[in-house]
Amino acid sequence: MHDTFKHTTVLLDEAVNGLNIKSDGIYIDGTFGRGGHSRLILSQLGEHGRLYAIDRDPQAIAAAAEITDPRFTIIHGPFSALAEYAEERGLKGKIDGILLDLGVSSPQLDDAERGFSFMRDGPLDMRMDPTRGQSAAEWLLKAEESDIAFVLKTFGEERFAKRIARAIVERNREQPMTRTKELADVIYAATPVKDKFKHPATRSFQAIRIWVNSELEEIEQALKGALSALTAGGRLSIISFHSLEDRIVKRFMREQSRGPQIPHGLPMTEAQLSSLGGRQLKALGKMMPGESEVADNPRARSSVLRIAERTAS
């Protein structure tokens, strides 16, 4: 069933332009969402070009059914496995570009039934793929107080993590939470100092969502896989929405652009040096949305686009 939730693709032209599309190229859109990037890529491909799109959200897979273009293939699964999908199709080292639009999408946030938002009451779920893994409610009910505090601090940078974790555990002992509003209310009550511009539950909801979906591990795995999937000259175009995501992408591109770091003065033969390989990426810079895009779509404000190119080594 087609959903009616509006989704405005952030940095649409910039991210696709970063792929440097060739008409007969082979591309991966690792985060199909509602197909904004995929449709633009397809519009720039010739008859022999190919686009493989990936998403683990069943609603995104349903939306992809609207695209009947023979050059397009949709894959239901996590983008962390993009290298496996490429290898299964005999495309290892042959991909001309990979695009990733990280984080949660507007349709996921806006649909109360998905449980991502503290602004809309719904089931306390938060899974990108509701058919797999445990929901936020299930995890919070079973987790130790110290584990909850760790997640809130690490993935939400929440300064009241311990206090909020204690309140969550105490509430679940009385009556297990099953709704997003219940969790938001517990967090609100446990937060001693309120931010004038941000709901107290913002950081905690982000942290729990990242943990439930293993989002940062997914990114790290996808980045490593991209190196084996891309051909020389192939592009990597990645949009991040918060500092935790961008830090991983930035560090990866920097490290792969630098090549192996060898301690000064360490004796090595030419063969040993050669076996270490050279740099595998060339970082091509970053972009942020302009004022007009942020005005049209406030969720674009924190987005960062980073582009890199696979080297021949």
UniProtKB/Swiss-Prot annotation:
Pfam families cross-referenced by the UniProt entry: Methyltransf_5
Gene Ontology CC, one term: cytoplasm
Gene: rsmH
InterPro entries from the UniProt entry: RsmH, SAM-dep_MeTrfase_MraW_recog, SAM-dependent_MTases_sf
Enzyme Commission numbers on file: 2.1.1.199
GO molecular function: rRNA (cytosine-N4-)-methyltransferase activity
Enzyme superclass (EC): transferase
Binding residue positions for S-adenosyl-L-methionine: 35-37, 55, 79, 101, 108
Key word S-adenosyl-L-methionine present: yes
Annotated keywords: Cytoplasm, Methyltransferase, rRNA processing, S-adenosyl-L-methionine, Transferase
Record-level GO BP terms: rRNA base methylation
Catalytic activity: cytidine(1402) in 16S rRNA + S-adenosyl-L-methionine = N(4)-methylcytidine(1402) in 16S rRNA + S-adenosyl-L-homocysteine + H(+)
Protein name (Swiss-Prot/TrEMBL): Ribosomal RNA small subunit methyltransferase H
Locations listed in the record: Cytoplasm
Keyword Metal-binding listed: no
Family membership noted in the UniProt record: Belongs to the methyltransferase superfamily. RsmH family.
Function: Specifically methylates the N4 position of cytidine in position 1402 (C1402) of 16S rRNA.
